[in-house]
């Protein structure tokens, strides 16, 4: 990270997170069969404590979920320091919001993503390396 100042990395992380969140939740709600394409081949999803790894297993998992309507309230992001992920541009994205799965009540959720930049000669694509989803049940 020495060649570019930290503010540039933060700005890049924010732009990537904003674009990613729009693509991810639109795909989740409207084109779920394509959702696993946003994940790296070795990615792991932890959904309320249950781990799912690999694109084929992720596809099967997402297809089992009822149709959804996500509403995003908060998006926070930060670049992951180069010492933690050498030679990889990595961003941590934290999301809070509500989701209504068909046949279920609306619930609060938190979701954390670790995204890595996958560069090709023509562009850079952000892929999910890790995803942790949790329903948020508040104490009354």
From Swiss-Prot:
Domain of life: Eukaryota
Gene Ontology CC entries for this record: cytosol; nuclear pore; nuclear RNA export factor complex; nuclear speck
Matching Pfam families: NTF2
Keywords, comma-separated and alphabetical: Acetylation, Cytoplasm, mRNA transport, Nucleus, Protein transport, Transport
Domain NTF2: 16-135
Record note on quaternary structure: Heterodimer with NXF1. Forms a complex with RANGAP1, RANBP2/NUP358 and NXF1. Interacts (via NTF2 domain) with NXF1. Stabilizes the NTF2 domain of NXF1 by heterodimerization. The formation of NXF1-NXT1 heterodimers is required for the NXF1-mediated nuclear mRNA export. Preferentially binds Ran-GTP. Associates with NXF2, NXF3 and NXF5. Does not bind nucleoporins (NPC) directly, its association to NPC is mediated by NXF1.
Protein name, per record: NTF2-related export protein 1
Gene this protein is translated from: Nxt1
């Amino acid at each position: 990270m020495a060649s570019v100042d930290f503010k540039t990395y933060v700005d890049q992380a924010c732009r990537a997170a904003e674009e990613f969140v729009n693509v991810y939740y639109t795909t989740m709600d409207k084109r779920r069969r394509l959702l696993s394409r946003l994940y790296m081949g070795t990615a792991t999803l932890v959904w309320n404590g249950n781990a799912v790894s690999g694109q084929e297993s992720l596809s099967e998992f997402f297809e089992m979920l009822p149709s959804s309507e996500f509403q995003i309230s908060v998006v926070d992001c930060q670049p992951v320091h180069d010492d933690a992920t050498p030679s990889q541009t990595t961003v941590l994205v934290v999301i809070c919001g509500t989701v209504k799965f068909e046949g279920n009540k609306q619930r609060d959720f938190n979701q954390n993503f670790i995204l890595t930049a996958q560069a090709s000669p023509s562009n850079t694509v952000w892929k999910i390396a890790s995803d942790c989803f949790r329903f948020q049940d508040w104490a009354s």
